[in-house]
Swiss-Prot record:
Protein name: Protein disulfide isomerase CRELD2
Summary of subunit composition and partner proteins: Interacts with CHRNA4. Component of a complex containing at least CRELD2, MANF, MATN3 and PDIA4.
Superkingdom of this protein's organism: Eukaryota
InterPro entries: EGF-like_Ca-bd_dom, EGF-like_dom, EGF-type_Asp/Asn_hydroxyl_site, EGF_Ca-bd_CS, Furin_repeat, Growth_fac_rcpt_cys_sf, LE_dom, NOTCH1_EGF-like
Length: 351
């Protein structure tokens, strides 16, 4: 088989139908995936179907199988799933090139990806280079972006070669430390950016004594940045129905227990005062049972008192109805109750 012209193949591979560029894999990705599968196929077929027996015979036979068309066919047949249209299309277009590399060029060009995807099809670039002309990434192809970031388009015919820095790094070559990080040498030529202490906005070392500037919510004290206790400020930063909790560099306002009128912390034991209907008992705000007080709160004749959380209600008993601000008997004592007559005290939900 005669390989097609590489320039034509490269053009066919790079052209994608209008409107589908975002849906299909890039030419470089398709090429790389095919090469990865081919390389895996070589691993899977290495010394296949041989093991034990006549070693001398095996070595002689294996040496023939290693570079044979039989082995190539086994590899090629396993490259693409039947349903993978993109893979099968690329394989159909480039199978002759793969055969040429396998039979004649493998020793001269042992790196299939470099020969097939970079040099021949021009679908990809070598690592550390980018774009149509495979230019060196920022910082050089050997160590793009100072080793602290990603080169946009690295290894492809796309991108602009600029650096997208890893966390903690900044600058066109990702060689500078961001605020909140300091330079920590690892060798004579390389250094890393390590995180400052949380108290520091800028720093030269890892502790709160190495701060150049303190973060918001921290102040310099005795040559170190220490947390500001905002909860101790006057006036207090939280609402009257809240209590303040100091956290590193800030504070949070939490709601008081519903039984409290002002509080110093969480729960009914932290109330400054109790709301109406509650009183301090054993160190916490407890509901007052108004119905059990010596001075009865329900003053109408025949009226029953029911305690509720923080209050009470006055209700006419079974067989009585409220009329003209009093409880009037509507059913003689002992008479059978009707559906309209209450037969039990109201529930808390009803109240």
């Amino acid at each position: 088989m005669r390989p097609p012209a590489p320039a034509v193949l490269g053009l066919l591979l790079l052209l994608l139908p209008t409107g589908e560029a975002t849906k299909k894999p890039t030419p470089c990705k398709r090429c790389r995936e095919l090469v990865d599968k081919f390389n895996q196929g070589m691993v899977d077929t290495a010394k296949k179907n041989f093991g034990g027996g006549n070693t001398a015979w095996e070595e002689k036979t294996l040496s023939k199988y290693e570079f044979s068309e039989v082995r190539l066919l086994e590899i090629v047949e396993g490259l693409c799933e039947a349903s993978d249209f993109e893979c099968n299309q690329l394989l159909e277009e480039q199978e002759e090139l793969l055969e040429a590399w396998w039979l004649r060029l493998k020793k001269k060009h042992p790196d299939l990806f470099e020969w097939f995807c970079v040099q021949t099809l021009k679908a990809c670039c070598s690592p550390g280079t980018y774009g149509p002309d495979c230019l060196a990434c920022q910082g050089g192809s050997e160590r793009p972006c100072s080793g602290n970031g990603h080169c946009v388009g690295d290894g492809t015919r796309e991108g602009d070669g600029s650096c997208q820095c890893h966390l903690g790094y900044q600058g066109p070559l990702c060689s500078d430390c961001m605020d909140g990080y300091f330079r920590s040498p690892t060798s004579e030529t390389h250094s890393i950016c390590s995180a400052c202490d949380e108290a520091c906005k800028t720093c030269v070392g890892p502790t709160n004594r190495d701060c150049g500037q303190c973060e918001v919510g921290w102040v310099r004290q005795d040559d170190a940045c220490v947390d500001v206790d905002e909860c101790a400020a006057e006036p207090p930063p939280c609402e009257d129905t809240q209590y303040c909790e100091n956290v590193n560099g800030s504070f949070v306002c939490e709601e008081c227990d519903p039984t409290c009128m002002g509080c110093t912390g969480k729960g009914p034991t932290q109330c400054r005062e109790c709301i109406a209907g509650y009183s301090k008992e054993s160190g916490q705000c407890e509901d007052i049972d108004e119905c059990s007080l010596a001075e009865k709160p329900c003053l109408r004749d025949n009226e029953n008192c029911y305690n509720t959380p923080g209050s009470f209600v006055c209700v006419c008993p079974d067989g009585f109805e409220e009329a003209e601000d009093t409880c009037v008997q509507t059913r003689p004592a002992g008479a059978e109750a009707t559906e309209a007559s209450p037969t039990q005290p109201p529930s808390r939900e009803d109240l």
